[in-house]
Amino acid sequence: MITVNPDGKIMVRRCLVTLRPFRLFVLGIGFFTLCFLMTSLGGQFSARRLGDSPFTIRTEVMGGPESRGVLRKMSDLLELMVKRMDALARLENSSELHRAGGDLHFPADRMPPGAGLMERIQAIAQNVSDIAVKVDQILRHSLLLHSKVSEGRRDQCEAPSDPKFPDCSGKVEWMRARWTSDPCYAFFGVDGTECSFLIYLSEVEWFCPPLPWRNQTAAQRAPKPLPKVQAVFRSNLSHLLDLMGSGKESLIFMKKRTKRLTAQWALAAQRLAQKLGATQRDQKQILVHIGFLTEESGDVFSPRVLKGGPLGEMVQWADILTALYVLGHGLRVTVSLKELQSNLGVPPGRGSCPLTMPLPFDLIYTDYHGLQQMKRHMGLSFKKYRCRIRVIDTFGTEPAYNHEEYATLHGYRTNWGYWNLNPKQFMTMFPHTPDNSFMGFVSEELNETEKRLIKGGKASNMAVVYGKEASIWKLQGKEKFLGILNKYMEIHGTVYYESQRPPEVPAFVKNHGLLPQPEFQQLLRKAKLFIGFGFPYEGPAPLEAIANGCIFLQSRFSPPHSSLNHEFFRGKPTSREVFSQHPYAENFIGKPHVWTVDYNNSEEFEAAIKAIMRTQVDPYLPYEYTCEGMLERIHAYIQHQDFCRAPDPALPEAHAPQSPFVLAPNATHLEWARNTSLAPGAWPPAHALRAWLAVPGRACTDTCLDHGLICEPSFFPFLNSQDAFLKLQVPCDSTESEMNHLYPAFAQPGQECYLQKEPLLFSCAGSNTKYRRLCPCRDFRKGQVALCQGCL
């Protein structure tokens, strides 16, 4: 007699109720999929002999791409089934619970009906996904390495002794011991055999010579370069807004900014197009990877966008994206590590292997976070393609911190340096480090009508404080100078707060809270004064205030702030001394728009306030911070900067050609001789060079500025010879060539001349009282210090 458990009847009944016709149909699809999987793959797996490596898969395996596609589709279908059944199960459970009025429940040790079936389907989906990955790798290997070698020849694979490949045997030894340390090696077909090591090291990497029996079949032909397309200026930015993506407050801010400035970018493009005339511009394929916005870097900026956090980086990135797009180049934008890996062609694994394909981008714009991510995941390809990278670097990277060996030996410690890039690959927010390239950003440009309206609507006694975060207002001693300012002006703040007024803000300050950008601009257009507390350093807000007709008042730092005495700069790859909150505003704009005073000197501060109230200024914006100025600058960089070309060696005197200079008529400096041909390929053009001998203890950056010029590090190789010293009437009793970021230089006493041995260490920055540095300077376009007169 057969007995039936009542609980079993109930379970069967519930399953029959739960598995309605649609669900039975879905399960049928799943069963059919599994059957198709086994039948379709059976032949392919049978083609592989037991014990063979991926290199010995028979070439009769056909339909590799199709099989991969089928596997992917089946995996996706099963995942979709799981999601649909999960949703239906939740709906069924909720409806049953609703009908039962809360009486129906499951014991703690029993799963709901159908849960076991769901788990099985999920496990099947995971297995199919895993099989898809494995088969995908196997089929890739079979197609990539389809030239099968006989077993006898395979046993004869040995590391060749070739003087052109001195590291080959060592790399083979390393592969024997470590090939399982990263799955990427198996992805490229390494299976532990000697032949697989040699094939990988000769065809994927380049440490071993090509194997003779694979030359004709396995060697990949270099892809044909795509036909050149001419870049065309764009004025419609709707596609750019789509490229920028969404989902982060930072991206929303950037898109709003781009949209607001659309008309100004369009007008700037029209003006630059007229200026360039028929100049041919090749369209570049450009990847923009904003590393600091990735989850892997922490993305500390996005959550603070709506809370008064710093916006300078997002302002700059929005303008970089827009400028590149308006110039007509092909853009790809990534803000996640997964997107970066996909666009670069990173193989699966831990980043030890090169990319799976040639880099499809002519240029990559990123930041230090993105640079770290690329180095971690590109393997040897990072070294191969790093010349195409441009690093957006707010505070600059000096050559002494960039050269890893030199920085390590001489104590130039930093959290961000040691990259061994050409220093011009680092691109700054302001032109404070001529060793780097000045990228910048834009401020809104007013037309003449708007300027007149602003000038007529100014309140003569209204001041706005620079600082949206309450922490900025914790400055010690602020009550003293704010008290003086309060005697003459009504003080306004835009400090973020959630529920109650920040206690750091004095009661006499009228705090508007965090304002949207249009409202903040309206506040600036009414104000007479924009006053800084000393932080943040070198942001875009002071330029924006000056452009809206404000006078900017800032504190003078004594002693100057640097990585030696100030926590903010500690660890940054620069020794630059900052003498005020905004050195660019002080040095390149100055009075009457910018006043720099000692806030600790009450008399000086009060006198400045009185003078400012009597001073009338017009809205002012330097050309290099207009949309046209930024377009002009980036166009010149893309056209002329080529860091993939091998640099000219810094030859010692015995091998250096005679310098093509003549002493200027006033005998103070060297100039390029008129009857001398220009250096081919030099940019900036060599005729812009002016060479000065600095006084002891003076950096080349300051020496050139003293003469109304800009230091130009690309001219250093022309001066790196004893002949340059002789032309300046400096006798050299001895000449030595060494690695030192201060060379070429003349040492006193001793009459010794020192030449530079390492091209990456040519540096405008740096000084020592022992040396008189030989400094290459150049002229610059009015309002555009990044470009010389003949650079465009």
UniProtKB/Swiss-Prot annotation:
Superkingdom to which the source organism belongs: Eukaryota
* Keywords (A to Z) from UniProt: Disulfide bond, Glycoprotein, Glycosyltransferase, Golgi apparatus, Manganese, Membrane, Metal-binding, Signal-anchor, Transferase, Transmembrane, Transmembrane helix
Its cellular-component GO annotations read: Golgi apparatus; Golgi membrane
The record lists the lineage as: Eukaryota, Metazoa, Chordata, Craniata, Vertebrata
Q: How does activity depend on pH?
A: Optimum pH is 8.0.
- Determine if Disulfide bond is one of this entry's keywords: yes
Q: Which cofactor does it need?
A: Mn(2+)
Q: Which residues lie on this side of the membrane: Cytoplasmic?
A: 1-24
Q: Which GO terms describe its molecular function?
A: alpha-1,6-mannosylglycoprotein 6-beta-N-acetylglucosaminyltransferase activity; manganese ion binding
Per UniProt, what is the membrane topology? Single-pass type II membrane protein
Q: Does the keyword Disulfide bond apply?
A: yes
According to the record, glycans are attached at: N127
From the UniProt record, give the pathway where this protein acts.
Answer: Protein modification; protein glycosylation
| UniProt-listed Enzyme Commission number(s) | 2.4.1.-, 2.4.1.155
**Disulfide bridge map:** C157-C195, C168-C208, C184-C353, C387-C644, C700-C775, C704-C777, C711-C764, C732-C753, C788-C791
Transmembrane intervals: 25-45
Q: Where in the cell is it found?
A: Golgi apparatus membrane
Q: What does this protein do?
A: Glycosyltransferase that acts on alpha-linked mannose of N-glycans and O-mannosyl glycans. Catalyzes the transfer of N-acetylglucosamine (GlcNAc) to the beta 1-6 linkage of the mannose residue of GlcNAc-beta1,2-Man-alpha on both the alpha1,3- and alpha1,6-linked mannose arms in the core structure of N-glycan. Also acts on the GlcNAc-beta1,2-Man-alpha1-Ser/Thr moiety, forming a 2,6-branched structure in brain O-mannosyl glycan. Plays an active role in modulating integrin and laminin-dependent adhesion and migration of neuronal cells via its activity in the O-mannosyl glycan pathway.
The UniProt catalytic activity note for this protein reads: N(4)-{beta-D-GlcNAc-(1->2)-[beta-D-GlcNAc-(1->4)]-alpha-D-Man-(1->3)-[beta-D-GlcNAc-(1->2)-alpha-D-Man-(1->6)]-beta-D-Man-(1->4)-beta-D-GlcNAc-(1->4)-beta-D-GlcNAc}-L-asparaginyl-[protein] + UDP-N-acetyl-alpha-D-glucosamine = N(4)-{beta-D-GlcNAc-(1->2)-[beta-D-GlcNAc-(1->4)]-alpha-D-Man-(1->3)-[beta-D-GlcNAc-(1->2)-[beta-D-GlcNAc-(1->6)]-alpha-D-Man-(1->6)]-beta-D-Man-(1->4)-beta-D-GlcNAc-(1->4)-beta-D-GlcNAc}-L-asparaginyl-[protein] + UDP + H(+); 3-O-[N-acetyl-beta-D-glucosaminyl-(1->2)-alpha-D-mannosyl]-L-seryl-[protein] + UDP-N-acetyl-alpha-D-glucosamine = O(3)-{N-acetyl-beta-D-glucosaminyl-(1->2)-[N-acetyl-beta-D-glucosaminyl-(1->6)]-alpha-D-mannosyl}-L-seryl-[protein] + UDP + H(+); 3-O-[N-acetyl-beta-D-glucosaminyl-(1->2)-alpha-D-mannosyl]-L-threonyl-[protein] + UDP-N-acetyl-alpha-D-glucosamine = O(3)-{N-acetyl-beta-D-glucosaminyl-(1->2)-[N-acetyl-beta-D-glucosaminyl-(1->6)]-alpha-D-mannosyl}-L-threonyl-[protein] + UDP + H(+)
Hey, which stretches end up on the Lumenal side? 46-792
Q: What is this protein called?
A: Alpha-1,6-mannosylglycoprotein 6-beta-N-acetylglucosaminyltransferase B
**GO terms of biological process kind:** protein N-linked glycosylation; protein O-linked glycosylation via serine
Write out the tissue specificity statement of the associated record: Predominantly expressed in brain. Expressed in all areas of the adult and fetal brain. Also expressed at much lower levels in testis, spleen and thymus.
Organism in which the protein naturally occurs:
Homo sapiens (Human)
Q: Which Pfam families match?
A: Glyco_transf_18
Family stated for the protein in its record = Belongs to the glycosyltransferase 18 family.
